[in-house]
Amino acid sequence: MATLASSTKPQKWVSLIAGGVAGGVEAASTYPFEYAKTRVQLLRTSKSTPSNPLRLIFTVAQQEGVGALYTGCSTLIIGTTAKAAVRFVSYDTIKNSLSDERGSLSPARGIVAGVVAGATESVLAVTPTERIKTALIDDAKNARQFRSSLHATQVLVRTHGLRELYRGLVSTTLKQSATSAVRMGTYNILKESFKAHDIPPTLFTTFCMGALAGVVTVYATQPFDTIKTRAQGVQGAGLVEAIRNIQSDYGVRGFWKGSSMRLGRLLLSGGIVFSVYEKMTYLLHSRAGVE
């Protein structure tokens, strides 16, 4: 099987396009898991709420229709396309400046590159789109006041001002920085390890590395995701208030609420996003005549 990447350092335009395509494909493919995770995190304690992601997805599809599983999907696809493009171009730019003459990156430097990339994508793309997506899913639990992503944006801005789209900026930036650091850092460690053992980066090995990075990311960063979601509900909450509410409602275990839902998504998305990114990078470099 042909390898997906060479030792060539990706050019910025390649990272931007490949990252955007990878993010869009990943978001569209795994959205039902994201919907289930967000819905569970927004609900107060309820014995009637399924905690198994597949069961919740089936229940929602049966009671509300399959379309309900894609509530807020367009917003997430747009946001994920943008954030993945920003993440990969930021990460690759920093990685290129920190890597040695052989193009290798130490684990510590890989984590630093991930933190910076995560913070950058949070400010430029993630916070506004996550705010809208979370508000749409939260709104769908009751009588709807939002007709679409655009309508939700208009209502939120008209009612609370433009700054409302950045509600939860601190919690989102913490979550994105941690997620990107762990995800990109873990993938970099695995990639360097495979390279050291002369294992070629095929589609299969790349998917496995990405999937494993996704699993590590879920349990290492879930508290940040839970706090971010609570802060970005329709009513909104400050960082400290969100933490207190979660602790009061569920105890310490509540900070990992929705982890099984997120695991299903990141297991797939980790494999998908890195596989698509590496493949797109390879194809774009081939078209540009870069060896």
From Swiss-Prot:
Solcar repeats lie at residues 10-97, 105-193, 201-283. GO terms for molecular function: citrate secondary active transmembrane transporter activity. PROSITE patterns: SOLCAR. One of its GO terms (cellular component) is mitochondrial inner membrane. Keywords: Membrane, Mitochondrion, Mitochondrion inner membrane, Repeat, Translocase, Transmembrane, Transmembrane helix, Transport. Mitochondrial transporter that mediates citrate export from mitochondria to cytoplasm. Both ctpA, ctpB, and ctpD play important roles in citric acid transport across the mitochondrial membrane and function in a redundant manner. It is an enzyme of class 7 (translocase). It is a multi-pass membrane protein. Disruption phenotype: Leads to fluffy and albino colonies, and reduced conidia formation, when all 6 genes ctpA to ctpF are deleted. Belongs to the mitochondrial carrier (TC 2.A.29) family. The keyword Transmembrane applies. Its EC number is 7.-.-.-. It comes from Aspergillus niger (strain ATCC 1015 / CBS 113.46 / FGSC A1144 / LSHB Ac4 / NCTC 3858a / NRRL 328 / USDA 3528.7). The keyword RNA-binding does not apply. Coiled coil: none annotated. Pfam families: Mito_carr. It catalyses: citrate(in) + H(+)(in) = citrate(out) + H(+)(out). It comes from the Eukaryota. The chain crosses the membrane at residues 16-36, 74-94, 112-132, 172-192, 203-220, 255-276. This is Mitochondrial citrate transporter B. It is found in: Mitochondrion inner membrane. One of its GO terms (biological process) is mitochondrial citrate transmembrane transport.
